[in-house]
């Protein structure tokens, strides 16, 4: 009898773990679909759709150290690009998604192919809402090969000094 009860208990626990794994895989696909649609909206210069994927308190971190924007600040920055009929084009090459145990938060990182910036990396956090997954934070970066870091470090430091010495009094 103990063996039967133990086997039943193990079967129940195992089925719950398997169901959660399937559910997490489904949620990961949903997050991926949101990100793909978000990138497609930028490529199509669909400003309304693009910004509908952001949470109201979202933050966008751009490639420049000065680029930390709320959703609304980023929209003001990006509006001229969308208004011209072509914003930007990011294609996810690889993507990894992790779903939090409470299934209300997901984080990801993705390698991106872009025609204007070259290889990039996007990472961020999405939150589950009654309207679906929303981007709470997105960080766009340009990976620098380790062998080039010293060169870029010097150029960035020099750029900062050059900008500070060229400021009007």
What are these regions (language model features)?
Residues 26-45:
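Short, aromatic-enriched amphipathic alpha-helices that serve as compact interaction elements
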Residues 44-57, 61:
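Short, well-ordered alpha-helical segments enriched in acidic and aromatic residues
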Residues 57-59, 65-68, 112-116, 140-144:
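Solvent-exposed loop/turn segments at secondary-structure junctions
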Residues 97-104, 126-134:
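A short, structured loop/turn motif at beta-sheet edges
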Residues 1-4:
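Positively charged n-region of N-terminal signal peptides that target proteins for export
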Residues 137-169:
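Low-complexity, intrinsically disordered terminal/linker segments enriched in charged
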Residues 6-16:
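Bacterial N-terminal signal peptides
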Residues 20-23, 30, 60, 73-119, ...:
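Surface-exposed, charged secondary-structure patches
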């Amino acid at each position: 009898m103990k063996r039967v009860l133990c086997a039943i208990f193990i079967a129940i626990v195992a089925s719950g773990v398997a169901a959660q794994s399937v559910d997490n895989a489904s949620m990961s696909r949903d997050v991926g679909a949101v990100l793909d649609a978000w990138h497609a909206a930028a490529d199509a210069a669909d400003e309304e759709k693009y910004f509908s994927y952001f949470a109201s308190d979202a933050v966008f971190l751009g490639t420049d150290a000065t680029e930390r924007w709320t959703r609304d600040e980023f929209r003001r920055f990006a509006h001229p690009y969308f208004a011209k009929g072509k914003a930007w084009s990011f294609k996810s090459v690889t993507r990894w998604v992790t779903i939090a145990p409470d299934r209300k938060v997901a984080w990801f990182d993705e390698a991106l192919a872009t025609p204007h910036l070259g290889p990039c990396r996007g990472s961020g956090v999405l939150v589950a809402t009654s309207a679906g997954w929303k981007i709470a934070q997105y960080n766009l970066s340009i990976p620098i090969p380790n062998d080039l870091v010293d060169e870029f470090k010097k150029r960035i430091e020099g750029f900062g000094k050059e900008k500070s010495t060229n400021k009007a009094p």
